[in-house]
């Protein structure tokens, strides 16, 4: 697509940025609402979500694929690591079952972003 990001990727980045910014704010502002065992660690997790949401938001605004692809790769890695570690914690019983929906959403974003990244890659780059 002439070195430009697709509409599908841009929409995905926008939804990703909005969702994880809200989720991150909830962790930072009200870790008790997230049933945190350790509020300080929950706030750090929230800050990480806010940082990744900011990166996705900035990538959404950028149209050149060459300037967006590294951000997309980082988001994919983050979502894979998030989904795997959360699922591990849930299955081991250390995290409340209420965390399944965001864990599944993280896995969905990882798959969706990976599929869009593969589709966006320009042959020969």
Regions found by a protein language model. Name each.
Residues 22-35:
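Short membrane-interface helical motifs at transmembrane helix boundaries
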Residues 62-67, 84-101, 117-119:
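Membrane-helix boundary connector in multi-pass membrane proteins
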Residues 22, 81-84, 108-111:
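Transmembrane-helix signature of multi-pass solute transporters
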Residues 1-19:
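Cytosolic juxtamembrane helix and N-cap/initiation of the first transmembrane helix
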Residues 108-125:
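Membrane-water interface at the C-terminal end of transmembrane alpha helices
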Residues 35-41, 70-71, 94-105:
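Non-cytosolic membrane-interface motifs at loop->transmembrane helix junctions
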Residues 18-23, 39-61, 73-81:
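Core segments of alpha-helical transmembrane spans in multipass integral membrane proteins
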Residues 4-9, 33-38, 60-69:
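Short juxtamembrane and helix-loop transition motifs at transmembrane-helix boundaries
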